[in-house]
A protein has these predicted regions:
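Conserved "right-hand" nucleotidyltransferase catalytic core of DNA-directed polymerases
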Residues: 1-148, 156-159
Length: 159
């Protein structure tokens, strides 16, 4: 295991996190305006209350008959509230997983991530390919143009 330093724009990270939180709050406000319910987007029972209020049928788990709101169902649901829930979840994931992780590990404008070459109790892979930990920089999103680009823009090249 060895480490490397990666420059981070700390102020921009705080601004991007704030921007993401504002967008998430706006989406949750739209849901509340339509349904009068303060929804917890990660709690299936809370999301179920929203769809019950709207009269929208939703899937349930086979064993426990609990509501189930997978990303696939939210993407394919024609109700606009489902899209708002999906977008709010996505934004929440970006700021709570990625930006919080960057902010937690930054020290004097740099992240000192660990690179694992071989499998061990602390990380690594069986195949010998490299893996990162603390934070895992290989998980930074690339597919989402809007949010992924903003998160990746926090990383700066060496001068």
């Amino acid at each position: 295991m060895f480490g490397t330093e990666i420059r981070i724009e700390e102020e921009k990270a705080s601004l991007v996190k704030k921007e993401f939180k504002i967008k998430e709050t706006e989406l949750l406000s739209k849901i509340k305006k339509e349904t009068t319910i303060d929804v917890d987007i990660w709690a299936a029972r809370s999301v179920a209350q929203v769809f019950d209020r709207l009269g929208v049928d939703y899937p349930r788990t086979p064993k426990s008959d609990e509501p189930s709101f997978t990303q696939n169902w939210l993407v394919n649901c024609s109700n606009p509230i489902a899209q708002l829930v999906r977008q709010a979840r996505e934004i929440n994931k970006f700021h709570s997983t990625f930006i919080d992780s960057i902010q937690r590990y930054v020290h004097k404008g740099r992240i000192h991530s660990e690179i694992n070459q071989l499998r061990s109790d602390q990380g690594g892979t069986v195949s010998g390919r490299l893996s990162y930990s603390n934070p895992n920089l290989q998980q930074i999103p690339a597919r989402n143009k809007e949010f992924g680009d903003k998160i990746r823009s926090l990383f700066l090249p060496e001068e």
